[in-house]
């Protein structure tokens, strides 16, 4: 089943076959999403981003591992979920699939005290931005229980893997000392919530 299945009451898949329908869909949706051709400046930015991707990923991953280790030792943090940590349940699998010391740039952790301290932590950050995105050059954080999953009951949140204390972090390429300092002052504010 394709979302763009009908064109003038004709079922493309039934008339032309699954392969042709898929090819047409790829072409039409691709043109719709990015246009006939990319503009020169967009092409330049894409190429520049692609050329520096490996360097940025090394920094992302190094920062994430350092932040995960810092959070593990912090008294206001109840748990840290990052496959690069040796106590992660899938650490062995992560070693099979990822390059050594490059386990991605997203981690989650729990702030002791639940919802109140979690929201206080997010609101207290100065360097990191509160956004639901991932993969940016800057550090992004979100408290899903009070934002993206707020409309769900606590039981529904728990069923979807979101706890009241959970913070999701997409770690950026800023200097790690700046990231850690921001999280340290945020966790100190959360302690006083």
Predicted regions: what they are:
Residues 109-113, 121, 171-173:
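Short beta-strand-to-loop capping motifs
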Residues 13-107, 113-118:
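Structural motif of enzymes handling amino- and sulfur-group chemistry
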Residues 80-82, 132-135:
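General beta-strand structural signal in soluble alpha/beta enzymes
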Residues 1-8, 12:
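Single conserved hydrophobic/aromatic residue that forms the stacking wall/gate
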Residues 123-124, 139-193:
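PLP-dependent enzyme catalytic core of the Aspartate aminotransferase-like
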Residues 103-105, 135-137, 163-165:
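A generic structural signal for well-ordered coil/turn residues at beta-strand boundaries
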Residues 76-79, 127, 165:
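Glycine-centered tight turns that cap/initiate beta-strands
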Residues 118-126:
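Active-site "cap" helix and flanking loop/linker of ATP-utilizing ligase/carboxylase catalytic domains
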